[in-house]
Amino acid sequence: MKFGVLVFPGSNCDRDVVLVTRDLLKQPTRMVWHQETDISDLDVVVIPGGFSYGDYLRCGAISRFSPAMQATMAHAEQGKLVLGICNGFQVLTESGLLPGALVRNRDLHFICDRVPVRVERTNLPWTQAYQAGQVITLPIAHGEGCYYADPETLKQLQANQQILFRYCQPNGEITPDSNPNGSVENIAGICNRQGNVVGMMPHPERASDPTLGYTDGLLLFQGVLNSLMAQGVTA
């Protein structure tokens, strides 16, 4: 299988993702410049964190119009896999591939921390390596990571089991105190109805290298790899 990592002016987590997919998982990976239009060779597209286009106008608002994102939208419409991390999550909501929006953190401060996150759904390629209700620890680093959705959209997210990750206490309890940024319902990550497009504010790629001492994020990438290999997708 082959991964592609989008690179916008201002991206700064693209190489972190490549380290995981190419160096840890040993999968072919190429970096996709924002002006590229042909990504037909890719099985999985990752939109990394950073400050695409300087976060001008709104986080992700300009990126959505890039040629590479237009190709990514077509990729997603074909049922292929797309992951947006942090700024990538913002790009996915701006492009309409995921519902809702990411707004300023509740306390209006940039947050950089490691937080417990509860896995809500495990029957998708992205989450199949986890256990339902499992609490994992992932880094966060964002200033506009507060997920918002209107009541009707939130109702649909819940009904369709589109909420994949929630901020929680170390014991898995969902509380206001465990919510670092004010996200509605403690939401840390969601998917589209089909389950092939995922957006999350925490950084799994920063919790993947054993050298760093914890690898909770690696299971997300390993789950995708196992799923596609089971379908017969090879390098």
Swiss-Prot record:
Subcellular localization(s) per the UniProt record: Cytoplasm
GO CC list: cytoplasm
Positions of the Glutamine amidotransferase type-1 domain: 3-234
UniProt-listed CDD domains: GATase1_FGAR_AT (cd01740)
Active site: C86 (nucleophile), H203, E205
Molecular-function annotations in GO: ATP binding; glutaminase activity; phosphoribosylformylglycinamidine synthase activity
A Pfam family that the UniProt record links to this protein: GATase_5
E.C. no: 6.3.5.3, 3.5.1.2
UniProt source species: Acaryochloris marina (strain MBIC 11017)
Pathway field: Purine metabolism; IMP biosynthesis via de novo pathway; 5-amino-1-(5-phospho-D-ribosyl)imidazole from N(2)-formyl-N(1)-(5-phospho-D-ribosyl)glycinamide: step 1/2
Catalytic activity: N(2)-formyl-N(1)-(5-phospho-beta-D-ribosyl)glycinamide + L-glutamine + ATP + H2O = 2-formamido-N(1)-(5-O-phospho-beta-D-ribosyl)acetamidine + L-glutamate + ADP + phosphate + H(+); L-glutamine + H2O = L-glutamate + NH4(+)
Function noted in UniProt: Part of the phosphoribosylformylglycinamidine synthase complex involved in the purines biosynthetic pathway. Catalyzes the ATP-dependent conversion of formylglycinamide ribonucleotide (FGAR) and glutamine to yield formylglycinamidine ribonucleotide (FGAM) and glutamate. The FGAM synthase complex is composed of three subunits. PurQ produces an ammonia molecule by converting glutamine to glutamate. PurL transfers the ammonia molecule to FGAR to form FGAM in an ATP-dependent manner.
InterPro entries reported in the protein's UniProt record: Class_I_gatase-like, PRibForGlyAmidine_synth_PurQ
Origin: domain of life: Bacteria
Gene3D superfamilies cross-referenced by the UniProt entry: 3.40.50.880
Oligomer status and interactors: Part of the FGAM synthase complex composed of 1 PurL, 1 PurQ and 2 PurS subunits.
UniProt keyword list: ATP-binding, Cytoplasm, Glutamine amidotransferase, Hydrolase, Ligase, Nucleotide-binding, Purine biosynthesis
GO biological process: 'de novo' IMP biosynthetic process
UniProt protein name: Phosphoribosylformylglycinamidine synthase subunit PurQ
